[in-house]
Each structure stands twice: as C-alpha cells, then as structure tokens.
Curated annotation (Swiss-Prot):
(6S)-5-formyl-5,6,7,8-tetrahydrofolate binds at residues 22, 79, 118, 448. GO terms for molecular function: GTP binding; GTPase activity; metal ion binding. The gene is mnmE. Keywords: Cytoplasm, GTP-binding, Hydrolase, Magnesium, Metal-binding, Nucleotide-binding, Potassium, tRNA processing. Its EC number is 3.6.-.-. SUPFAM superfamilies: P-loop containing nucleoside triphosphate hydrolases (SSF52540), TrmE connector domain (SSF116878). Belongs to the TRAFAC class TrmE-Era-EngA-EngB-Septin-like GTPase superfamily. TrmE GTPase family. GTP binds at residues 224-229, 243-249, 268-271. This is tRNA modification GTPase MnmE. The keyword Transmembrane does not apply. It is found in: Cytoplasm. Its main location: cytoplasm. K(+) binds at residues 224, 243, 245, 248. Homodimer. Heterotetramer of two MnmE and two MnmG subunits.
Length: 448
C-alpha cells in the first residue's frame, strides 16, 4: 500500500456554499503549519487562513485535524473547509500538491481505511452505496451495512464454521480417543441451522441488491396481448407502437421508470410464437435471452381466453429462479374485475392497460418483489456478495452430504468447511486478491 500523502476535493463538483479538501498521510502537522501557519488542535475546528507559497491568502475557512489512528483512514487526516467555488477549490488543492501531497486515486481514502483496519470491505463498499443510493430505503440499508450489520451477520456464520472445523480437527488429531466429536457436538444439526441462516442472509442480500440497482422486468407473452400497451402505461409515454396487428414489436424496447424511488428496468419483447418470418424469429430469440437475464417476468395473457396451451409452454420454459407474474390483460372487454390473486405458477393480476384498471396493483406487486416493504430488514449487497454467499451455500451443502454418508470422510468435510469460510471471507475482505481490491475501489469518488 502506498503510504504517501494524498489530497482530493471531497465535495461534489460545481459551486456551493462550502467546499472540502481532504488530506491523508503520516505526520501532517508540518503540512498544516506550512499551509496555515498554525498547529491545529486534534479534533477541533480552527479558523485559519490558507496560505499560498508567497504568503498571500488563498481562502479563509476551517481547519480540522484528526491524528492517527482515530481518523477515517487510520492515518493523520486534515480537512480544509473553505468556500465552495470551483476556482478557489482548485487553487487550494494545487497548494496542497505543491506541499508534497499527490492527487488521490478514486476510492483511495476508503481503501486506506480498509487496509488500516478501520472498516472491512463490505463496510467500505457501503460508503459508495450510500452515496449512490437513489431512494431513502436504499440509503437506510447502506447505513446499516456501513455500521457493520451485514459484516456482523457474516461474522456469526464464520464463527460457526470455525467451531465446526475445530471439531473436525479434534477428531483427526485424537483418532485413538473413542469419542465421536461430530456426533457429540450435533454437527449435523449445526450444519442444518447454518444452511438456514445462509439462505436467510442470501435472501436479505438479494433483496438489498434489487433495492439498490432495481428490478429488470421483462414483458413476455404471445403476440397482440397488450405488452406494448402495458409498457406505455407503466412508462407514462408512448414508447412502443401499438396496433391490432400481431407481431408489431420485432425487437426489445427498454424503459427505466421509478416506483416509490425503486428503479424498474422494463423490457418489452417480441411476441413468443412459432413463425416463418426470419426477422421476427431473431426478435423472439432475443426475447428469450432477455428473459434469462431478468429478475421478473410478466407473462401477459388475454383475459378473454385465459391461459392457453402456448402460454403454458412459455411458463414451463421460464427459469425456476425467476419471479413471475401472470397478467390477465384486457379485462375491460370482460366482466372481470381488477384484482390480485395467487396461482400455482405464482402471482396473477387482472388489469387493463388500455383502460388503466389494476395498474396500481401491478406496481405494488413489483414493489413487493423489489423488497420495498421489507426495506428495514435487507442488506445493500453487490453481485460479488451474492456469488460468495452462493458458493458458501454450495460448500456447506457438500459438507452436509459428507456427514450424512455411511463412512464420513473427515478430511473432505474439513475442506468443504474451509472453502465455505473462504467464500464468506471474500465478502469482508479477509480473503481478497489485490486486483479485486483495485477494481472495487476504482469505482469510488475521488474524495472517498
């Protein structure tokens, strides 16, 4: 890790009442004196003139000094709070660079905080997630992760894995003892509880990812069932051409909307049917690719005819992991009322895109799937967190299979537990390659 002095503007670009420059390094008292002709008192805001090399005043503002290790980065930290004009901020930053600091790389302050043990990797990522939060729910979830709630949950799982590994090591180290350590400690029951806890955290993390990045929703179904009309209704604009001619939509149309601040990335696809039209065939192939990448599929059917055999074939082909909502459209042409109910294949909603009936029911169902109503329980998570949790689940399941075997192979059991622990360690940064750290922190703001 580089240990030189770094500096960056920590406030957003543009004009503002206050601008902040953050500086981090070792032994910054001489730096502060050269800049202000004052020796700052730790953790006090001091009024100071920020001096240029010729002794003239660049700006007057507040100087704050946080000595190591009680600072954000774990190093000495200075914060210069001046007037928020872009010119004066650049002049003040240039003076800091003249005094020996270099311009911080994106995320370098947070990276130093991580490497100095001030926060783990999940907490460091939560800093960026809090900055990027598009909704109050996402912001609150990011704060919980920043305060260590997600990390503590991972830590509890890690502790249980360590305890189980200790039992295995005891059995391997004392083979002459007539004691079945795994049976005596109820290893099977503990693995079962560990699996349940892993599944719970995976679900909460998955909901948090949706809360932050939004749902990818695909409108699917046979031609001329109202997919484009529903897209236009949800988007509040005429994005798609709507005609009574089947097969009007040949390629995917995309729109991003927000419901209660939750991003919804909606894709209207070509009607799914057998066709000899080569252009339409390409559109249908792309439709299935969009479905495979989505979080939710809205299968639209004509409320007048109900679910057809072709619709059942579409349902059967949908990936099991997908949330699915069967949408009975065109209820304005029937005696059916707008409603939500459960079916064997998932949730069903009766509505009319054309007459704007039942649209709010669909919006609320999408919010439910996105975790909006359970926002206080979710963790803001990233795709890499979900991959690591999934890998840990696989290794714990493999360990359980070993225990259930007629002749348990203790070495294999221990190895699966070790791999599960390593997967969890990737979340908090205990087992993380340097190149991955570079990718993660490069996506941060310069001043973070």
């Amino acid at each position: 890790m580089k240990s030189d002095t770094i500096a960056a503007i920590a406030t957003a670009p543009g004009r503002g009442g206050v601008g902040v420059i953050r500086i981090s390094g070792s032994n910054l008292l001489p730096f502060a004196f050269a800049l202000t002709e004052k020796t700052p008192k730790p953790r006090y805001a001091s009024l100071a003139d920020f001096k240029a090399a010729d002794g003239s005043t660049i700006d007057t503002g507040l100087l704050l000094y946080f000595p190591n290790p009680q600072s954000f980065t774990g190093e000495d930290v200075l914060e210069l709070q001046g007037h928020g004009g872009p010119v004066v901020m650049q002049m003040l930053l240039a003076r800091c660079l003249d005094l020996g600091a270099r311009l911080a790389e994106p995320g370098e302050f947070s990276r130093r905080a991580f490497l100095n043990g001030k926060m783990d990797l999940a907490q460091a990522e939560a800093v960026a997630d809090l900055i990027d939060a598009a909704t109050a729910s996402a912001a609150r979830s990011a704060v919980r992760s920043l305060q260590g709630e997600f990390s503590r949950a991972i830590g509890e799982l890690n502790d249980e894995l360590i305890n189980l590994r200790m039992l295995v090591e005891a059995t391997l180290d004392f083979p002459e003892e007539d004691i079945d350590f795994l049976k005596a400690a109820n290893a099977f029951g503990r693995l079962e509880r560990l699996q349940l806890k892993l599944a719970e955290i995976f679900d909460r993390a998955g909901q948090g990812k949706l809360l932050q990045s939004g749902l990818h929703v695909v409108l699917a179904g046979q031609p001329n069932v109202g997919k484009s009309s529903l897209l236009n209704r949800l988007a509040g604009d005429d994005l798609a051409i709507v005609t009574p001619i089947a097969g009007t939509t040949r390629d995917a149309l995309r729109s991003t909307i927000q419901i209660e601040g939750i991003p919804l990335h909606i894709i209207d696809t070509a009607g799914l049917r057998e066709t000899d039209d080569e252009v339409e065939k390409i559109g249908i192939e792309r439709s299935w690719k969009e479905i495979e990448r989505s979080d939710v599929v809205l299968l639209l059917v004509d409320a007048r005819t109900g679910v057809s055999e072709s619709d059942r074939e579409i349902l059967a082909r949908l990936p099991d992991r997908l949330q699915r909502i069967t949408v009975y459209n065109k209820i304005d042409l029937t005696h059916r009322a707008a409603e939500r109910h459960d079916e064997a294949n998932g949730t069903a909603i009766s509505l009319s895109a054309k007459a704007n009936q039942g649209i709010e029911l669909l919006r609320q169902e999408l919010l439910r799937i996105a975790g909006w109503h359970q926002a206080e329980d979710v963790f803001i998570a990233r795709e890499r967190h979900l991959r690591a949790l999934s890998a840990a689940q696989e290794h714990v399941a493999a360990a359980r299979n070993v225990v259930e075997g007629a002749l348990p192979a203790l070495e294999l059991f221990a190895e699966e537990l070790r791999l599960a622990q390593q997967s969890l360690g990737e979340i908090t940064g205990e087992f993380t390659a340097d190149d991955l750290l570079g990718v993660i922190f490069s996506r941060f703001c310069i001043g973070k």
